[in-house]
Amino acid sequence: MCGLFGFSDPKHTLPQKQIRRLTGSLATASEQRGTDASGIAYVQGQTLRIYKRPLPAHSMTWLVPAHTTVIMGHTRMTTQGNSAFNPNNHPFPGICGDTRFALAHNGVLHNDDELKQRFHLPKTNIQTDSYVAVQLLEQDGRLDAETIGNTAARLEGSFSLTILNQFNHLYLVKGNSPLCIYRFESGLICYASTADILKEALARCSFLPRSKEIVSLSEGDILCIRPDGRLQMSRFDTSNLHKHLRWWDCGAYDCWMPQSRRHFRRNTTTSLDTLLETACNMGFLEDDVFLLLEEGFDESDIEELLNMPGAFYGAIAETVYARMDE
């Protein structure tokens, strides 16, 4: 689990001080999804810049230049590839023809090794599963909604992607990992992995208006935010999206289908409904909450675990492994 965050301000409504404040607020709020590393990509002139470090977001200094209109950010919880080796961290640089881009990923890919062999991708010292998406795009030779869709359609596992090119085109690719987007009347668009993160970040930015609308994306949607603020929507083939899902993608509960799931659903209380809503808003799966309930965790235990994602998924893992031994 990692955090995606960022914004597009095509009409230059934010002065430099507010740009930095918004960037820092989004990054710090996204820490709940990863503290191993943090990074952003932005465009200065027509030069793509990437600033990332193996540090939690609150320890970073976000020195974003004036006149920056797009920020694409990431907070990392390490699953593959040591975060101390900075090339393993997001966003990743890439190049398609004459176009440079940066890519960030939230999720876990299962078929990265298979894709490397199938498409004869070059060896690299970057050890993360995410980087295969960069290599596939580079092999296509151009960067647009079609080639991004082709790459997304080949991925198996869990993901949402964000991609920024040197011309300030920002692509938000919605797979089966969470992504929440708000649009303001000024044309400003802000996004984060979950609604709770986005609300927390924006609450720290009193200079932003309260009036906004949700931009809804479904699995398979690709939203391109152009430099002039126009939105272009396209789709990718989702037939591989839920192929060979593992317990940490689809929810361990579905893997085991215990009978008490129906019991819990029939006997939900107001407090449990609230817990489930909170979990979903934070990017957790309802089925994993039910699994922990069946294992004997009470609602207060689970509520505490939601604030410690590593401990939450650790509890899920222990439960699944124990059942595999039964």
Could you say what each language-model-derived stretch is?
Residues 1-326:
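Conserved short alpha-helical segments that host acidic/polar catalytic motifs at enzyme active sites
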